[in-house]
Amino acid sequence: MRKTAVVAAGGTGGHLFPAQALAEALIARGWRIVLASDERVAGLAQDFPAERRIGLSAATYRPGDPVGMMRAGFAVLRGAMHARAAFREIGPDVVVGFGGYPSAPALVAAILDRRPTVIHEQNAVMGRTNRILAPHVRTVACAFPTLKKAPPKVAGRAVVVGNPVRPPIRALADVPYVPPEPNGPVRLLVTGGSQGARLLSELVPEAVKALPEDLRRRLTVHQQTRPESMNTARRAYRDALVDAEIAPFFRDIAGRLREAHLVVGRAGAGTVCEFAIAGKPSILVPLAIALDDDQGQNARLLADAGGAEVARENQLTVDTMANALEKLLTNPARLQRMAEAARSVAIPDAAERLADVVEQTARGR
């Protein structure tokens, strides 16, 4: 008889993409997948391989807002009651939470029903939902070797598995890095993430304009930008005489990552792990408003290994970005060293490792 896993994930790509990678790994092992989340997930989960989806009420709150906390608590309880009713019909063998407040109702229901439970934390800093629920679940898995803000007993038993990534990204682990020739073409990829892309959309094109002419003539840029920034970015690259592809979203991000000599991006957990797996040198710009500076802590994985430079928003200008780009793009030997350092901390088989943990938990081990 096929086993069933309920995968509960928040409605952003940072939570959903690793959840999907796990789902695909479990399906390959014969499991049936049920996705539990709120209505926000619909736009991102069109390709999620779930046989069934459960929409659950959930809400978040701002720290220091007791009324908001009460409302969020009632919403989670309503969602948990709905989940318990669904679980009686589905009979899941395990419930796996990936963080974000929409994951809470399914996990609360599983905890109340004493069902096997797993939490996966994508960031180097444990998120608020996972932090609250982790002491009550059977198994905690994490992506990074350090897990800040976790209760001490939780951090001590967390299993490091890495961040599950989509198969096209996983395939890049076997592709060697080839640095640019001294006078040859140079390819720069600029990613944005779901939050805070405006800064990179506007600053990087201006920084490229400030590069020496001989470097600009060899440069090709692929950049994700917000729709409202596309015309400004195109104009800047056109003025700089730089060949550039500008789009809000690249469906074949793996292909562009494969060809890039250097990547500039935020430091979301998935982004950092993807750069490591692909073995790409990077300039990381942690989102300044990220809760608990989780992006800054994520960036340390690559920076401490020597695979990335970190540029803090409060110190970032057109000139500092231009200087960082020039120093790296004109130094192939350093790019090669950074690529090797980035790949040294990668865990490309994270989806399989997490699937092993899920199966062990379901068996009661």
Swiss-Prot record:
UniProt catalytic activity: di-trans,octa-cis-undecaprenyl diphospho-N-acetyl-alpha-D-muramoyl-L-alanyl-D-glutamyl-meso-2,6-diaminopimeloyl-D-alanyl-D-alanine + UDP-N-acetyl-alpha-D-glucosamine = di-trans,octa-cis-undecaprenyl diphospho-[N-acetyl-alpha-D-glucosaminyl-(1->4)]-N-acetyl-alpha-D-muramoyl-L-alanyl-D-glutamyl-meso-2,6-diaminopimeloyl-D-alanyl-D-alanine + UDP + H(+)
InterPro entries in the record: GlcNAc_MurG, Glyco_trans_28_C, GlycoTrans_28_N
GO MF assignments: UDP-N-acetyl-D-glucosamine:N-acetylmuramoyl-L-alanyl-D-glutamyl-meso-2,6-diaminopimelyl-D-alanyl-D-alanine-diphosphoundecaprenol 4-beta-N-acetylglucosaminlytransferase activity; undecaprenyldiphospho-muramoylpentapeptide beta-N-acetylglucosaminyltransferase activity
Gene Ontology CC terms, in alphabetical order: plasma membrane
Pfam hit, one: Glyco_tran_28_C
Keyword Membrane appears in the UniProt entry: yes
Disulfide bonds: none
Name recorded for this polypeptide: UDP-N-acetylglucosamine--N-acetylmuramyl-(pentapeptide) pyrophosphoryl-undecaprenol N-acetylglucosamine transferase
